[in-house]
């Protein structure tokens, strides 16, 4: 056996990436970057390589129960670590120890899966032994369904250098098992169980005789098991059944030799332990104690008296724990015997090493006798694992670190905090490490001594031949050896072995039960939980320490080094070694020559070993050949070798563990070059900035220095005159074009000129400074629109305020008696008299009256609101002259009207007090009437129906004459009272008879007839009648007929009321639509692919970062969302210190030295502005543990634009069109421009998602923050309603209290969503989906018909010629609203919805000027868009509430906002001044409007909005008057370009002057992706078929080629469009997280690297290094795959061998079936492949193996294709689906 290398604590430190050229890592690893990378590998079920000797994996019980390609379960492990450990052991003839450490109590065991991934064949008995041992050392706990209760368990493998296992053993560490937690002191909480073996015992399907002999009962009958009340395994486990597990255990025990009498002794001991546990209660009854001890003594062969009398309760407790641990040791010893027996059979040739699955292992005669030991040490104890790892990594006082320091290698201190934590960890785990000096150690020592004493006391008196004694005394005559014999000395193993670390992380603190409900096995994730584990173990410091300073995985004595590598040119002596190192291109950091040793990093060592492998065996130097691969064993595949060396199996498509559902599992590469050749093709622009402006040392992303130091430069000539502007008026030297004008446009122009003909154009040109005809025309159009708006507003004000007065004058100057009665206040004191209404509020309090009759307030108060006719009658002889009435004659008034005698004012001779002024007969006409005239208000009116009713029904003697009402009731009653005395009958009988016969009627005609006849026949009679009529007017007149209810007066009111009712109905509907009381349950996770588009213009860094962070943090599957940032030009916003694209790229963590080429595409612009250039960047962005792919497109403009202020800027609409057009061409598989081809390549081949998979487009603004669940809610809404084409959520303000201007917007934002949009959403026709937060469906769910990416929408939305006022307002101001209008126009039967539960926040304008500008755009675009909507045909709904009507209401409401404000001001004035009737209905409507809104706030518990509503109302004049007026008048306030000038419109033609070279569409080459990919050897070709069904696991568009690079930006081959330099390429950096710690500098060894022109890109995978961080080497031809399929003896697991980046993975979309498939057929084009019978057989075989209750059809299809080793498409896919249904139906 080869000698052991002592104190080899080498922990390798190569990063996840490929070999580093520098000696030190350039970037430190932080917790965030490490957290990001861990999340990536968790999603991909891959390991993460922390350094060359350390791997991290993430596992849960879910991942541990998933079957791998070999059909076994166990979770994620790193086979590469096992392979590295083996290669170091065999090549260096040194022992190794792989520590499987757990960082969390919930992590499952990975011992068995790790052993299965080992690069040598292990005997099957090893796995059977571990299977048998598991129930003894694991138990159920709430935090882990298989919680380990042992400190450490080791499997030691002794192998010869040929890779044959010569010996193997299993052993517990000396710390043993925690029997307290697993048996004696189970927590009395639900969810805990004892060791699983006891439940298996009770559930075992043993014979009845066996159960009777053991006396077994239910688990609840045993005190040891009944503490927690949990007896069954967790129900969430897919195979949770103690009975089945018991059968498996019995079979496993039988395999390792525990059968027959041994099995009976074994189960007897277990039963005895259960029974003995019933005696551990201090209060146990003595009889019960004796009975139990009698039973236990019989099972164990021990005298019951010893157990009952000589052992205390504590002794029995110690006995139970010690005996159980001794039983476990016995099981392990039996297992080791079985392993040795199998190995003996293998050596004898009777059995193969892998149980018959492979070739026979050569016997011992075939090896040279040297052996090495590899110990796989599982350390589930958190404290022990942490102590072992941190001491080995950070402690410089021992191990390899100490040896390096002594040899002169600079070893930086780990830092005081790290060393302190390391020391604390070692102290904490001291007893487990054998250190008994501390308090815990002394307690542990006391426990062990006590246990030995009790076991010896009981064991001595046991029967000599009993099993019990054999357990306690396995070696006769040596006493109790428990914890020593057969145990593993961890300190000794580590002291003689090279240590490797395989650390298991758990992704969440959630209970295991909660994981069962997750949608996928990799869904559980808590960044805080993982971060806590990383920090607790100091893994960032670990990575930085190892990778920066101590990345040495091999070390040699100087002589040994020379001897081994002399054949490669290494010469003797230190100088010879250093010279050879320099020749190899290794820096001092890669190979360090110490005082006595040479220390090598992993990459350098493998390069040297690779060169040795390439040498013929005969050339090997002495001492080296025996360490090389022996005959018949393939050498390791290092990636640097050409013949391989047996390290890794061939890594190809079939070996990568990725799928399109597993994004972020590979390191992304961006595809651009650092430099271009001197020449370039016309189709591609050179780098944007001239070389003289580019900061090559610091990097500027290839965007130049514009905006960083000098902004908005204006070019002037030597004379200081502005240059570059066109002649704005004349079209000289310009190309003249003629365009057809639509009929509607011609009619509008005619109307404009008809209204504005009187305004001369010279006046506009010279006074208004409008030199251009199109600008003047826009002003005229604006004038006409404002004039029309003014007329509408004036009409509204006139209609509401003045029309009613014109139709019904004096309607507010009359009152009924009841209305008069309402005025009884101290300041509102009204009375009526003789048909007149008086307001005596200023009179009644004034003392007045005669001597002795002074009127006071108390006396006057009762008369308020009353009629004073009976109280103040005129003298009858004065009121009725010419009728012969005596001066004392008076009528008797109605008694009911003169109840208060104090009010009687009898004037004239009838006054009883001659001294009173009333005694004057002229007091009434001369004093009373003139004074009352001062307080006259109007006429008293009577309802005609009331007059008629009382006259006809109550014999009320009153009539109507000429609309005057005369009441003769007192006249007739006085006559009746006076018996018709002649003196009281002073009225003409002809008149009174009419009244008597027609009371309550209109007698105008009758009386007029009497007057006419008298006038014709008898003038005396006529004179008498006239005197009668005069008397009527003076004495009997009581008012006029109420005219306010006539048709003339009511028509306008009814019109207003009708509109009021309609408005109220709309408001009520809006209110109802806002009352959505449904629960806000979070929808289930969605699996749709979504592009999150963020157009960036001049936003600041804070806004951009918040927007990107919010998208990254969305609670949506990270692999199914893509952030697409489109920077609209290279320009610097106000307050920024650099251009917006640079800010975006800085945030995303892109390397500033990256300079992708500028690629042409067609923009939305006039003439030559349609040609634009853009750059594409891609990578990963990390925030709070979420890692999301991104694509950034920067519009950089043509070369001629670089001197302008805004190169590349074409507007937000162009940014939207850029992506929409790309997705349109992806959908139709149409030819693409170079920029789109590069975008397709970045998304499809680098990010790994077929762009056709994306189903939704989420549009947000760069200053918008989206709530975490918003995207899920929007997608869920669309998933539940396939008719939804667009949907938006609620937008609120994030800066609501920043200024007064933001405060007045809060309420408006809330109510515009919860009333307006919620109401429109009822019709499925939200008229404005805001661009700041809207999601569109890309294609219909049923037939895949394109929606927002349809040709019609893109054609209308990308109108390049925006040269009229209407188009300007549509496409330049309100592009978001117009996009909604176009969607509604082209897809009228689709729905556009509002989801109030999807929430985002945006930044509102904080300054008045900004608010003014924003609202100008909004208001004007609203008007013009609603006009467009009014013209649509399919806008009708149900009843009158059609969508067209709602649109009309919105349009009209926007236009008449100023009138609304004026009317509200008028109302306030009217109410405040009391100059008119109280507007009750209007105020009720206003109260209803805002009351319902307030009710919404209250019901939604948004109390704060009540306050915001008050602030909004205070600012109402601003919103309804100032902003609209300003907006209307500034409709033509645009920047008018000089490229195309409309110089005139005549008839059907528009004359346009063009001042540039124009745009030739042929200047932008177009090519289909498949043709482009085929011509340039790119993967991801999709074939000619249309879109196919997208599956979760298997995709029909598997990669076909052996490379993933962009023709525009990858190094090889040069772009067919750019002809770029072939010597350089760049690696696109990821976000500041995952891989900043990996150097990107190329190395000088082993030929080209991924960062140079790598010729290995097309080589067989045998020659590709798993260490190379590249995607080039991942692929190989199918023929090469088949040639090397069996080249390596190392078995491969699914997934790569080198973790996240060390081994390449397929991008998302490469499924497991695709990885294992070696061919892909389209049976429509290729007749090869399986026939129908083979497919049916495969389906039946798969259905026999899967769980039909949980498996999905897609999974069955994937498994069938995997079994067939073929991907089925076309008709074969259809047949497969149909046959699966048939088989399921027949089962």
Swiss-Prot record:
InterPro entries named in the record: Chitin_synth, Cyt_B5-like_heme/steroid-bd, Cyt_B5-like_heme/steroid_sf, DEK_C, Myosin_head_motor_dom-like, Nucleotide-diphossugar_trans, P-loop_NTPase
Main function: Polymerizes chitin, a structural polymer of the cell wall and septum, by transferring the sugar moiety of UDP-GlcNAc to the non-reducing end of the growing chitin polymer. May play a minor overlapping role with CHS6 in growth and differentiation.
Membrane topology term: Multi-pass membrane protein
Glycosylation sites: 164, 643, 657, 668, 695, 894, 1018, 1420, 1533
Entry's induction text: Expression is induced in vegetative hyphae and infected rice leaves.
Entry keyword set: Cell membrane, Glycoprotein, Glycosyltransferase, Membrane, Transferase, Transmembrane, Transmembrane helix
A molecular function GO annotation: chitin synthase activity
Primary location: membrane
DEK-C domain ranges (all copies): 1729-1785
The keyword Glycosyltransferase is annotated on this UniProt entry: yes
UniProt protein name: Chitin synthase 5
UniProt similarity note: Belongs to the chitin synthase family. Class V subfamily.
Stretches for region Disordered: 1-26, 345-367, 1628-1657
Example of a GO biological process term: fungal-type cell wall organization
Cellular component aspect of the GO annotation: cell septum; myosin complex; plasma membrane
EC assignment: 2.4.1.16
Compartments (UniProt record): Cell membrane
Organism: Pyricularia oryzae (strain 70-15 / ATCC MYA-4617 / FGSC 8958) (Rice blast fungus)
Statement: the UniProt record of this protein carries the keyword Glycoprotein: yes
Residue ranges of the TM segments: 747-767, 783-803, 1055-1075, 1445-1465, 1478-1498, 1506-1526
PROSITE patterns with a match to the protein in the record: DEK_C
Pfam families, per the entry: Chitin_synth_2, Cyt-b5, DEK_C
Catalytic reactions on record: [(1->4)-N-acetyl-beta-D-glucosaminyl](n) + UDP-N-acetyl-alpha-D-glucosamine = [(1->4)-N-acetyl-beta-D-glucosaminyl](n+1) + UDP + H(+)
